[in-house]
Structure formats: C-alpha cells, structure tokens
C-alpha cells in the first residue's frame, strides 16, 4: 500500500506486516509487481525496485529524467511540453519497462545502470516490419522446444518467458501515441517524399534492417526467448535477401561464439555477455539450433536466387 506521506507498506496475504514502512522522498504514483519484485515510481520521477523475498534491490533508485528529455528541454529558452509516463511495468527479471506519451519505450539495464530505448516513432514510419510478424518464419520453424525439450505450453509458465509481449506492447504504444498526436501522417508523407528522391533508393531497406536489429537487441535485453527466436530468423532472412555478406558472416560467427575474435588476439579471462559470449545458450536457445535454422533460411534464399538466374 502507498500513502500520501511517501511511505510504502507491505503485508502478507493474511494481513501480517512483512517489513517496516518504506519511506520515499515523494508520494508514490505508480506501483507494479511481478513475482517477488515490486516497482514504485514516485511523484518526482524516481523508480524503486525491491525484491520482497530477499529484501534487497537489484540497483539503486533510478530517475526518469533521462527518458523524459530533461537534458534537451533544459537547453531551450522557452517552455515546452514534455512527455508523460503512460505506463511503468516490470518484466520477469525485475527490469523496469516504461512507455511514454511521445511514443518512446524504454527499459532500464540493471547491469549497465542506463536507460535503453526499445521503441520509437521513427521505426513506425520508415520500417516495413512495423506491427508485423513474418508468418512464413513463425509457421515453418522446425521446433519450438528449448534446451530441455519441453513444449511451448510448458515454456509459457517459466519465468524466463514472461518477458514475451513487452516489445509488441511498446510498439503498440508508439503507434497509438503517434496517431493521437498527428505525427504519423506527417512523417509518412516525409518518408514517401524521400523514397522517390535521388540518392534515397535504399532508405526504406536500411531503416527496415535497422528496425529488425533493434528488435533482436531488445529481445535479448529483456530475455524474451520466443520473440528473440522469431526476430532473429526474420533478420537473417532480410539480410540474406539484401545480399549483406558482411552482416551474414558476422551473424554466423556470432552464433558460433566468435563474433569479434581475432587470430592474433590473446585469450581474455573476462567472459562476455550476449553476442560477446563465446559459449552457452542465447536467450535460452542452443546456439547450434539457432545456427542450423539460420543456415537453412540462407540456403533457401540462395537456391531461390540460383533458380532465378537459370530462368533468366
């Protein structure tokens, strides 16, 4: 329970007090819980996250000032309307997810102590993949089993998969806020004008590839297992169709665990995370399985390309 005096009280389901009152520097305005994690956002934009089970916090209190464009607004000589917080949520790992009225969506990194932007209106008007999912990928994937061979029905109950749906939620908020503010029509006209201009022939393609890369990175950041798998295959299909040899080679090397490894480089004792990790699974998926599916997609694109050449 949150009170006007800036205190937060926690009780058990039976009504017993679990901990002493938690005193904040301002009145709580947004609260959310996910599992044992409790999120509290107060009136001055400070975000607190507590683990009620371990009576600890994954990171110090963090301010919403960076995502509210405080730095940009302070440099202007006149008063401007700043974005408002539409919702604040927690994922299964206790990570803060925030959606704003300007269409931006952010997540706070507990490891790097920084806000990361996961969604923005720019992708909505320039990407061919906005509000879409490649059904040809999702329907032909050979398996949806994880490392332990269980079905997706069982995976939905596991904590690592509770982040599923966060990226579509943020993108839907981006679409809604862009339409409400009337920006979508103006930006779409601007992009259409650029597409027919000389020198911008590959503009839409570049934005679409960048949007898929943003989706893959966001899914990895949030630990969204099923979405990472889908977006990765969509990305592999797109860069294969674009003929981006350097990106294809780097993607294959990263799936094998040696994306930035040089022949003359000495072994580093410090272990990397994400794409920098040399071994282990990627967001709950075995690297060998992901590599096999990516190679299968690239092989189909290559065979289709060779058939077209023979027909010509």
Where are these regions (language model features)?
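Long, contiguous hydrophobic alpha-helical segments, chiefly transmembrane helices and signal peptides
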Residues: 1, 8-11, 40, 50, ...
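Sequence-level detector for tyrosine residue identity
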Residues: 48, 106-108, 113, 129, ...
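WD40-like beta-propeller blades
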Residues: 1-86, 108-129, 308-312
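C-terminal scaffolding/assembly regions of large eukaryotic complex subunits
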Residues: 133-312
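Acidic, small-residue rich beta-repeat scaffolds with periodic aromatic anchors
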Residues: 92-95, 100-142, 146, 154-165
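Short amphipathic alpha-helical molecular recognition features
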Residues: 19-23, 30, 39, 80, ...
